Amino acid sequence: MMENYITSFQLRFCPAAYLHLEQLPSLWRSILPYLPQWRDSAHLNAALLDEFSLDTDYEEPHGLGALPLQPQSQLELLLCRLGLVLHGEAIRRCVLASPLQQLLTLVNQETLRQIIVQHELLIGPWPTNWQRPLPTEIESRTMIQSGLAFWLAAMEPQPQAWCKRLSLRLPLATPSEPWLVAESQRPLAQTLCHKLVKQVMPTCSHLFK
């Protein structure tokens, strides 16, 4: 697992340095055990840029655009937590054993309690349609996709090449339905993202300013 920060240069030119293993074609995954230093291979990086049609000529966003540069576990934890918060109303009302058990496989009891308690305090009244019902199967990758969709909606429209690189850092999953965030709501959406950064990655919040 990639537990180092990714540089802007690596994000642009070195997909092998950050690509989630699940994103690789199956044939490539079968070859990697024979290439122990594959993430550092210039030839493989060039091949991956071509394989995923990754354009290297794009303008890197700032502020919330620091997201794909974070260590893997922190990146996934942040987006998963944001995804859970976006289902906070449904979690608060949840009384069935099965979904509660599924939630407790993602977070511990104290974190789940925190999500419930802080639901109405994070940004005040929630805008219409920002909160969603819980899916039947509550999985980390599903919540990560929810968090990702909202995070992107909170930003100005970003270069497709940058968005694609961010998605390649994450486990394979069905993309979430887009979050509809009006331009006038973006400051509030960004505030929510920044608050989650401070909760999950308190020592790194300056990177997102």
Swiss-Prot record:
InterPro entries: T3SS_K. This is Yop proteins translocation protein K. The gene is yscK. Belongs to an operon involved in the translocation of Yop proteins across the bacterial membranes or in the specific control of this function. Induction: At 37 degrees Celsius in the absence of calcium. Keywords: Plasmid, Virulence.
